[in-house]
Amino acid sequence: MAPSRRLLTSVSLLSILILLLAVWSLRSGAVTLDFSQVFSALLGSAPRNITMVVTEWRLPRVAMAILVGAALGVSGAIFQSLMRNPLGSPDVMGLNTGAWSGVLVAMVLFGQHLTAITFTAMAGGILTSLLIWALAWRNGIDTFRLIIIGIGIRAMLMAFNTWLLLQASLETALSAGLWYAGSLNGLTWGKTWPAAPLIVLMFIGALLLVRRMRLLEMGDDSACALGVGVERSRLMLMLVAVLLTAASTAIAGPISFIALVAPHIARRLSGTARWGLTQAALCGALLLLAADLCAQRLFMPYQLPVGVVTVSLGGIYLIVLLVQESRKK
């Protein structure tokens, strides 16, 4: 199959799978609905109680699973492109832990104030990335050193987060603990503001910068010869990736491994780097939607935080990836 046809097939297949999983998620739960009831509720012609179940309880969760998964997929693709390293992702480097530190500070100081949570998550992610970048700088950036320092910063931030939880009230600690596991439980449309619009804005920013990202993949000298400001472009792309991670953390907590795994699966499916961000977004959305469905259904009537499922599957994938990289060397 020609690459262009294979690319189109993979994008179409991912989109169809996302749509099917989304509809299945809307009909399944403590109250199982027919497909006709789901579509009637979406069109506003179902009874009021069914419409409320679908549009107010389940649809926000499904929509945010797709949006957050896509955001993490794009963020991971940008990091792996900039670092030229398959282990380059915001969760491995600790950026989502930094964003979570910001969320935790906001919850301790301001309670569950959504605007404060979003902006402190952004601040935490940006400050963490600047700290990692500053410590890794030695007349330039070596990606291996950057990742190792990121892992170290992540460990220190986890210790800081544990200390904050111990200082918080019992109610705040319980809420923060559930959020820390990475959860889409209890999401409503009101809880998506202002993080969801920020993710959409960052998607637009990523699309505007995708050409620069592809030129940077050719090497700094080649990109510079083609008129690209290397450091400025790298900084803008990094900012977009960090804000995508921070906004996702503000909505659902620090969900791990989606950003690491989605770009790899996207490349394997398509066999090309073209449309890399689109493929990574679709893979991320599909992975998180599937993980959330598993978290809801596997242990009924109990529901797991979706982060437990992604960590379990992502940990296995990370081991396989490390073994493959060691064999190459």
Briefly describe each language-model feature range.
Residues 1-329:
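Alpha-helical transmembrane segments in inner-membrane proteins
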